[in-house]
Swiss-Prot record:
Positions of substrate binding: K45, N69, S70, M71, G72, L73, N128, N194, S195
Active-site residues, Swiss-Prot/TrEMBL: C131
CDD domains, A to Z: DHOD_1A_like
Keyword Cytoplasm: yes
The protein's name: Putative dihydroorotate dehydrogenase A (fumarate)
Gene behind the chain: pyrD
Organism per entry: Streptococcus agalactiae serotype V (strain ATCC BAA-611 / 2603 V/R)
PANTHER family: DIHYDROOROTATE DEHYDROGENASE (FUMARATE), DIHYDROOROTATE DEHYDROGENASE (QUINONE), MITOCHONDRIAL-RELATED
Entry binding sites for FMN: K45, T46, N128, K165, V193, G220, G248, G249, G270, T271
Molecular function in Gene Ontology: dihydroorotate dehydrogenase (fumarate) activity
Entry note: cofactor: Binds 1 FMN per subunit.
Length: 310
């Protein structure tokens, strides 16, 4: 019997597939639709200290090869999502969940995390160190000194399981430098990758999204090679206790298989979920199981990280 079960930081999931933060997770209704789908879990919209409207519309556009967006972290505020996942965790047959969050400053991040620390929520946290679409706010994880400082401060008081969502890295030296920092801390996971920041898509003679004069994060098919490279590079460098969530370019079972082959313990779906809805989890699960059965694999552990080299 082929199984898609997986585990992160002691939390078990019946299916390794879930949504990516930012997609189909703004409201309780959207999150419940994923909860009731074949997905193994959901991650909430990235919650900030206060609710945000985000960037002006239009701020998302589909393309033939994926998508471009400059959402600007629209969300209903951390209290909305924290209350919801806390309420859900006490229900019978509830799945384990991931609460995504970030402050618009290091001070705000600490305020939010201390709120979570003092709450009764006992699930996973995904700290977003990689949003490329908030004007005037750099992606923290590209500043290694700042990343080290923030993680040091967080783990001086935060005791619950926490992982981080990362931007894509493109230099081998950066993989080495980042992994050295991450291995210093009791991270539950890293998520590779957020969208590739500051792409530009043009229709005829005009940009397709309004914020930042058309500059936005690139997702979908286009970023899969970059996502796979990040997953595998960190799989080879991180302590085994730090699991990896693979995100980027997943629209079918083969894409999910490749992320796991590169070392991912869970796989998130973003652009394709936006286009297809929660029904995508049933299809991709079926396709992934068929691939595994054809290859004689019964579990994800049979092939996770077992990428062959020439």
């Amino acid at each position: 019997m082929v199984s898609l079960k997986t585990e992160i930081a002691g939390f078990s999931f019946d299916n390794c597939l879930m949504n990516a933060a930012g997609i189909y997770c703004m409201t309780k209704e959207e999150l419940l639709a994923i909860e009731n789908s074949e997905a193994g879990s959901f991650v909430t919209k990235t919650g900030t200290l206060e609710a945000r409207e985000g960037n002006p519309q239009p701020r998302y556009a589909d393309t033939d090869w994926g998508s471009i967006n400059s959402m600007g972290l629209p969300n209903k505020g951390i209290d909305y999502y924290l209350d919801f996942v806390t309420e859900l965790q006490d229900q019978d047959n509830s799945k384990n969940h991931v609460l995504s969050l970030v402050g618009l400053s290091p001070e705000e991040t600490h305020i939010i995390l201390k709120k979570v620390e003092n709450s009764s929520y006992n699930g996973l946290i995904e700290l977003n160190l990689s949003c490329p679409n908030v004007p005037g706010k750099p992606q923290i994880a590209y500043d290694f000194e700042m990343t080290d400082l923030i993680l040091s401060e967080i783990f001086s008081y935060y005791q619950k399981p926490l992982g981080i969502k990362l931007p894509p890295y493109f230099d081998i030296v950066h993989f080495d430098q980042a992994a050295t920092i991450f291995n210093k801390y009791p991270l539950a996971f890293i998520n590779c990758v957020n969208s590739i920041g500051n792409g530009l898509v043009i229709d005829d003679e005009t940009v397709v999204i309004k914020p930042k004069n058309g500059f936005g994060g690139i997702g979908g098919d286009f970023i899969k090679p970059t996502a796979l490279a990040n997953v595998h590079a960190f799989y080879k460098r991180l302590n085994p206790s730090i699991k990896i969530i693979g995100t980027g370019g997943v629209k079918n079972g083969r894409d999910a298989f490749e992320h796991i082959l590169c070392g991912a313990s869970m796989v998130q779906i973003g652009t394709a979920l936006q286009k297809e809805g929660p029904e995508i989890f049933q299809r991709v699960s079926r396709e992934l199981k068929e691939i595994m059965a054809d290859k004689g694999y019964q579990s994800l552990e049979d092939f996770r990280g077992q990428l062959n080299y020439l």
